[in-house]
């Protein structure tokens, strides 16, 4: 399992006009079951690199492959199907405010996969309880408490057992009672072969999870660098 490369960013230089990332080549390999922690002081750079991993950013050079397929070579419906294998916590929310949070949680998987709604709903309810929600929230995002909306974001990111999990600053500004349910679920996901990339402003926030961390990296103006921890 550990030899399977899930995500391969190979000398990828993002388009200067379309990305907030510094205009330098990026290299990263994530194998099944691995976890990479990326430290950066810029939330904007975190989102931009997560977009690069998801095949959203146009490249001037290099390639980004997910599960062996190069994003730039894919068209619909294969493109949407592959993005359905990615779970993500967005640091700016990524909620559609006209819909209840429950619909926001289920909608990405319903759009990107052929999973039955009753199966997804059952899994979503289980995840809600794990993260401290009594059930699927029926309020709209603007009417949710920030901490409960963050719990819902964790549920959405893990729904459908994604192969790649991208977490943009999941702990900053939230209480520690969210740490351990997420650590537990990430540990389970890695054991099943998922790859995890987590963005943080401080490596120290991940000390409790360091035994499952494969690489520590830093994202700066000069690009991605490997760090020793």
Go through each PLM region and give its residues.
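Helix-to-loop junction immediately C-terminal to a conserved catalytic motif
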Residues: 54
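Conserved ABC transporter NBD signature motif
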Residues: 62-72
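ABC ATPase NBD coupling module
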Residues: 71-87
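Q-loop/switch helix immediately C-terminal to the Walker
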Residues: 92, 98-111, 123
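Conserved ABC ATPase "signature" region
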Residues: 119-136
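Conserved ABC ATPase signature
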Residues: 140-148
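Hydrophobic anchor residue at the start of the ABC signature
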Residues: 154-155
